[in-house]
Amino acid sequence: MGSQIRAQIEAQLKQRILLIDGGMGTMIQGYKLQEQDYRGERFADWHSDLKGNNDLLVLTQPQLIKEIHHAYLEAGADILETNTFNATTIAMADYDMESLSEEINFAAARLAREAADEWTAQNPAKPRYVAGVLGPTNRTCSISPDVNDPGYRNVSFDELVEAYSESTRALIRGGSDLILIETIFDTLNAKACAFAVDSVFEELGFALPVMISGTITDASGRTLSGQTTEAFYNSLRHVRPISFGLNCALGPDELRPYVEELSRISETFVSTHPNAGLPNAFGEYDLSPEEMAEHVKEWAQSGFLNLIGGCCGTTPEHIRHMAMAVEGVSPRVLPEIPVACRLSGLEPLTIAKDTLFVNVGERTNVTGSARFKRLIKEELYDEALDVAREQVENGAQIIDINMDEGMLDAEACMVRFLNLCASEPEISKVPIMVDSSKWEVIEAGLKCIQGKGIVNSISLKEGKEKFVEQAKLIRRYGAAVIVMAFDEVGQADTRERKLEICTKAYRILVDEVGFPPEDVIFDPNIFAVATGIDEHNNYAVDFIEAVADIKRDLPHAMISGGVSNVSFSFRGNNYVREAIHAVFLYHCFKNGMDMGIVNAGQLEIYDNVPEKLREAVEDVVLNRRDDATERLLEIAEEYRENAVGKQEDASALEWRTWSVEKRLEHALVKGITEFIVEDTEEARLNASKPLEVIEGPLMDGMNVVGDLFGEGKMFLPQVVKSARVMKQAVAHLEPFINASKQAGSSNGKILLATVKGDVHDIGKNIVGVVLQCNNYEIIDLGVMVPCEQILKVAKEQQVDIIGLSGLITPSLDEMVHVAKEMERLGFDLPLLIGGATTSKAHTAVKIEQNYSHPVVYVNNASRAVGVCTSLLSDELRPAFVERLQADYELVRDQHNRKKPRTKPVTLEAARANKVAIDWQSYTPPAPSQPGVHVFDDFDVATLRQYIDWTPFFLTWSLVGKYPTIFEHEEVGEEAKRLFGDANEWLDRIEQEGLLKARGMCGLFPAASVGDDIEVYTDESRTHVAKVLHNLRQQTEKPKGANYCLSDYVAPKESGKKDWIGAFAVTGGVNERELADQFKAQGDDYNAIMIQAVADRLAEAFAEYLHERVRKEIWGYAADENLSNEELIREKYQGIRPAPGYPACPEHTEKGPLWELLNVEETIGMSLTSSYAMWPGASVSGWYFSHPDSRYFAIAQIQQDQVESYAERKGWDLLEAEKWLGPNING
């Protein structure tokens, strides 16, 4: 029965967008019913007021409800919702009508069924369906109604299950085709509802399709209980609904970004039924049917929708206009979502094959933390919450909670603590791992978490029947599961037994229970080593090897383990224990371990373990020698406790005798801050009001600065220093201005932002400073700013211009998105485009055509003032815009008519013309020091010697090559001053440790396979750790090869044992914090200086490390002796191409690099959603050693290569085109 209905509805959904009906309450209000209408004859003498009990009307006014159903069906609705929003026993208790719940649900379904059947009979080609509605109730299972007791709940999970079960049975008996769980503001309520619905389906022997619809309550983009859209989706994905959607609380305008997100992440059909706008001052909804239809049409055309309907304030007319709006528009096509474990707290956590190691915080476990156990025993729950909070702050992405202690009521403690965690967003943002050896404690915990958590753990030790029973319940609760390698015989202690038990459990879970394989997490048992018992010596090796076996044989399953178990023999010596954990995890991660239960605040870095200790630990962990335990014990005790001022002469201070107005001008032009506060105060005392100081001498001085800069007589570093002086003066005046309620005038208000996914902002900061110097008010939103935030702030602050910045190529697509959204939302502000990756051609061809108001490419800071002046001037703007549009038209025309200088070739032909290397006569050099090497807090004095200063001067718009720039007639003196300031900063960085440089590199066995490169786990070359995907030049090359990076690595079939290197370095640890401090002080000069110096240190680190790799670590050029200039000119053997740059332009290839090196866990560098590196002052890439290797640019590729790349990466074509866009021909 249920499967036939689902197949029928799915077939309809693939053909067209289906219509859900609109607001039931809105229509009932239109009848203006009185108390007696609600009572009817049956309830005439009921003891409480019944007006407002809309669900009761299915019994007292059935014809009225049926009339409303008919009106919606006539308007075009395909799906009718039953009038049961508040019909559960819990909600009906407000009227003392709990006993009527079943009858009301049945009657409501029957009324809707009759109406639907009448319309289906009239037109069988358009069948009508009934959705049995299960509303949210008036209670919240994950939020306390008592602000004084955040752990209190006024309804339990079990009470909700009981209420929803009764309603579900009645809705099905009454004739519902679907079950709609809607208006979900507390996800835990919805999980209880879904649990009830699935239980009833099992009881009845068939399942109806389930629709789920949540409610984003406000502009925060979260449900009332705090979840983001994706976290909410992950929490209920286990229901496998026919549709996932959003409804109520917001109108279509406000709801749009969340529907868009849902359409992107949902693997099932997407529905939405928004309100008719937001309620006005009288609680009424103002959005007309025509206006709402316009929104709906745009959503449909954007590919967001499969089902559309209405909620509060909507009527049959709204549905009629929606039906007309979506008629003929193709429904959203279901996307292919990569297989991944998708967990959630208040925020999502996706663990995919390219995710780095996941830390599970272990300190909220009474069996593993004496402090936590004491706090729970003494009922000091607030302090116990601090333990959880510390784990998250220290990097735990999941927290494991265990209350198994003989003197505790584990079930009560688990419930109390989880309820309190739910009230702490800093804790509850991460998923929860419910950990207990008692099934009743696990179930109690699952009934408290609204997100998708993990059960730790179940096993086969009590036999298959118990195992299956528990697994089915875990799946119904919507959790992932850890499965211990434990059966009736006992715990698996050998490699073979671990694989045998895990395979058996996997087949039962996946094949019989229907458990998603990506939600199965095996714990193959980590046992203590170095116990003195010979049989235990190989325990770590068995685990490490079993990890590789399980990852190979059991698709999508993950591996976890309690890491501290391995070092239990050394309890009391934390330093040695941490060293054992570091070594053990290093080898486990290389073999594919996904997560581990660890103390997130005490993870040691593998390469930071002293060499003597590390070697002894490796002997133990890898069981390399018979006396390994004795040797480690001998040295363990050694580690038990380890755990500018220049004196101004009289002539230089002559300006101090001038008038205060002239002193202020001089200070601004020269960038002198020493006397600015006292001079500003003197000027204030002389003025009739504080604002006169800004609009008088200060702006006069800044006008001089602007004129000198425009004439090329002042340079950018000087202008930034001037801005610092101006900001300090204004900061002194602001309290006086505020006190007198004065408001100054500016030339205009400009919003600047680095777009979502991008972390680079030096150029944006410089533009902001230059504009401030010319009396523009700047609102700087910083980096990684989402489109909706940019446009929201622009509206709220009523800005005059929006400026977007970005460095990496994915930022170009985000800029196009912002332009489209500005057009859709009716903005008429000018849009400025800037950043290293932008260009006039891209702006003209890709961005400007999506926005009908001025879009201006600004290629440097000095041009920004003139552009803004022209755009905001009534006199200058028309001519400026006319010239701009003519210029862009010319650029587009040239782009369209441009004949490629080179002829494209097929991918097959390009591959046939690969670099010709005689591999048989070449022996690839084996590295002297294979593996991963970490350089933490590296010596800045060493890096200074490798700095290439020429780009540093370009950052400040001083053009010239170092060191000859110092002799330049115009910019030489300023370059010298800038160079001096930079070196003073480098001195401070060395002496005070203000910036940290961290880096790492690794050398791995590798072989090329076509255009890709296989990187192996070890020198046996039997297991592939990662595949690096490369692009090949695809233009005709009569005299040369069509280069691809894989050409420089020995082919697999050659039998040659080649290697590849990877590196990641940063010079910017603490850079953002320092820069922000200076900005807060109004010191833009030093804020930009620290970023520029950090950038240079990162590039210098990359240069230094490559040299060291060539000479020592790989050692293929041990005799190399090059000057810094020769290094800059790349006179060495080998190359270090970086993902995102010409030879390998596709940014997602940074992901495998991060995983091979374990970058984020080891040195703290991370990747944004657009694969920009954080900190911004970072460099990463690959090392190739072949003497013929050279840099090249991929340039334009053809469709056949796009398709090949997509197939190799496991992407659909749209995903490939998104990331390869800048390189796709045409």
Curated annotation (Swiss-Prot):
Binding-site list for methylcob(III)alamin: E695, G757, D758, V759, H760, D761, S805, T809, A861
Annotated ranges, domain Hcy-binding: 6-326
Transmembrane segments: none
Pathway per the UniProt entry: Amino-acid biosynthesis; L-methionine biosynthesis via de novo pathway; L-methionine from L-homocysteine (MetH route): step 1/1
EC numbers, comma separated: 2.1.1.13
Keywords: Amino-acid biosynthesis, Cobalamin, Cobalt, Metal-binding, Methionine biosynthesis, Methyltransferase, Repeat, S-adenosyl-L-methionine, Transferase, Zinc
Known cofactor(s): methylcob(III)alamin; Zn(2+)
The AdoMet activation domain, residue ranges: 898-1226
Disulfide bond annotation, renumbered to this chain: none
Cofactor note: Binds 1 zinc ion per subunit.
GO molecular function, one term: zinc ion binding
Domain B12-binding: from-to ranges: 747-882
Domain annotation Pterin-binding: ranges: 357-618
Remaining remarks: L-homocysteine is bound via the zinc atom.
Primary role: Catalyzes the transfer of a methyl group from methyl-cobalamin to homocysteine, yielding enzyme-bound cob(I)alamin and methionine. Subsequently, remethylates the cofactor using methyltetrahydrofolate.
PANTHER family with a match to the protein in the record: METHIONINE SYNTHASE (PTHR45833:SF1)
Domain notes: Modular enzyme with four functionally distinct domains. The isolated Hcy-binding domain catalyzes methyl transfer from free methylcobalamin to homocysteine. The Hcy-binding domain in association with the pterin-binding domain catalyzes the methylation of cob(I)alamin by methyltetrahydrofolate and the methylation of homocysteine. The B12-binding domain binds the cofactor. The AdoMet activation domain binds S-adenosyl-L-methionine. Under aerobic conditions cob(I)alamin can be converted to inactive cob(II)alamin.
Name of the protein in question: Methionine synthase
